Design a protein with these regions (language model features):
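Secretory targeting and sorting signals
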Residues: 1-40
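A low-complexity, Ser/Thr/Gly/Pro-enriched, surface-exposed linker/loop concept
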Residues: 41-63, 88-146, 182-215
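Extracellular glycan-recognition/adhesion modules and their associated mucin-like linkers
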Residues: 65-76, 148-154, 158
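Extracellular/lumenal glycan-associated surfaces
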Residues: 76-90, 154-174, 203, 211-215
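Acidic, glycine-rich flexible loop segments
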Residues: 131-170
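Polybasic (Lys/Arg-rich)
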Residues: 179
Length: 215
């Protein structure tokens, strides 16, 4: 075999080895190129999946009394909530077991979200102060019943009743869930101070122990 043939055969072998090596590199590196993002969006809690609820006409839930300032009210039988008077204002009255414990000087009245900019905050009262936030109609308006499986939307707020002892309200990036045994608050990722805290994870159902942000 002459030198030219040897060089040609060696060149073909080198190209074949290079092709095999490139294919192996793609096979090894392929999964890394298609891997899922490290920070996937949190799942939407069932409390805020509106496809599970029947919307109601908000008209009968809005008080026309001047003293109620256009607010919308409802009761679940266990919880009393109100929407308004401005866009994305909502509050629910009551204290789940994980709310701040009452003391001789203060007790928890409920929680509220303000214009989707602050909250949920606990609304508390005490011997030396009273909150500016007021629960319930000032008139004789009787809040209608929002039933299990229904949703109510008014003034940029949507509330649902997943179960007889549970209520959930969302303004956008903020939300609250009340049950007798626990509460869960949601707020935007950028907000580190404008809200009250959630209970320790062990007090929440497993499906809600993760993120405090909504998708």
């Amino acid at each position: 075999m002459n030198a030219v043939s040897t060089i040609r055969r060696f060149g073909k072998l080198s190209r074949a080895v290079a092709v095999v090596a490139a294919a192996a590199a793609v096979a090894v590196g392929g999964p890394a190129l298609t891997a899922a993002p490290a920070h996937a969006a949190p799942p939407l809690p069932a409390e805020f999946n509106l496809s599970l609820y029947t919307p109601v006409n908000p008209g009968p839930f809005q008080s026309l009394a001047y003293s109620d300032n256009g607010r919308t009210f409802f009761t679940t039988g266990r919880w009393n909530c109100q929407i308004g008077p401005k866009m994305r204002y909502v509050g629910c009255q009551g204290a789940p077991a994980t709310a701040p414990a009452p003391t001789p000087d203060a007790k928890t009245l409920g929680a509220a979200i303000t214009a989707d900019q602050q909250g949920p905050w606990w609304v508390r009262t005490g011997f030396l102060y009273t909150p500016s936030y007021k629960f319930g109609p000032n008139s004789g308006f009787r809040p209608p019943l929002l039933r299990v499986g229904q949703s109510l939307t008014a003034a940029g707020v949507t509330c649902t009743v997943p179960r007889a002892d549970e209520v959930a309200c969302r303004t956008g990036g903020r939300a609250l869930i009340f049950t007798p045994g626990w509460h869960k608050f949601y707020w935007p990722a950028w907000d580190s101070k404008g809200h009250s805290s959630n209970p320790a994870p062990q007090y929440l159902p497993p499906r809600l122990r993760g993120s405090s942000q909504l998708p």
